[in-house]
Amino acid sequence: MTSVIYPGTFDPITNGHLDIIERSAVIFPRVLVAVANSPSKKPLFSLEERVELVRQSVVHLSNVEVFGFSDLLANVIKQHNISAIIRGVRTTTDFEYELQLAALNRLLTKGVDSLFFPPAEKWAFVSSTIVREIYLHGGDVAELVPVPVFNALKAR
């Protein structure tokens, strides 16, 4: 069975992330969403909270699995017998950075390629960073994030 992985910090997961997961789930029989610990980024939500928010956001997708990780992505890829890495790219800056990571991951995994998904037009400007900034300044992010994330932000 072809398995792909969509790694990220997902702090928080946005509707742009969810769109990429849904599109991947149509194409591939098994999609693993790997939520990175990333303590250096000083996340708004803990790893456990982010994993749970992603799980709640993809509950309608039967072929999607969600887990957290702190290891090197290449090691996670080997452990789960992954065929490809899914990455979202919004801008040329994203693409240049992701191209470098793709080459590095291909080297470290002995040939696992990265597949780049452009965003749906309505999510092209959305990022977790932008969502956090809007939220921290009292703005409304209801249209930018899945309902479980919006509810978690309201509860903070």
From Swiss-Prot:
GO terms for cellular component: cytoplasm. One of its GO terms (biological process) is coenzyme A biosynthetic process. ATP binds at residues 9-10, 17, 88-90, 98, 123-129. It is found in: Cytoplasm. Its EC number is 2.7.7.3. The record marks 17 as: Transition state stabilizer. One of its GO terms (molecular function) is pantetheine-phosphate adenylyltransferase activity. Keywords: ATP-binding, Coenzyme A biosynthesis, Cytoplasm, Magnesium, Nucleotide-binding, Nucleotidyltransferase, Transferase. Reversibly transfers an adenylyl group from ATP to 4'-phosphopantetheine, yielding dephospho-CoA (dPCoA) and pyrophosphate. Homohexamer. NCBIfam families: coaD_prev_kdtB, cyt_tran_rel. This is Phosphopantetheine adenylyltransferase. It comes from Haemophilus influenzae (strain ATCC 51907 / DSM 11121 / KW20 / Rd).
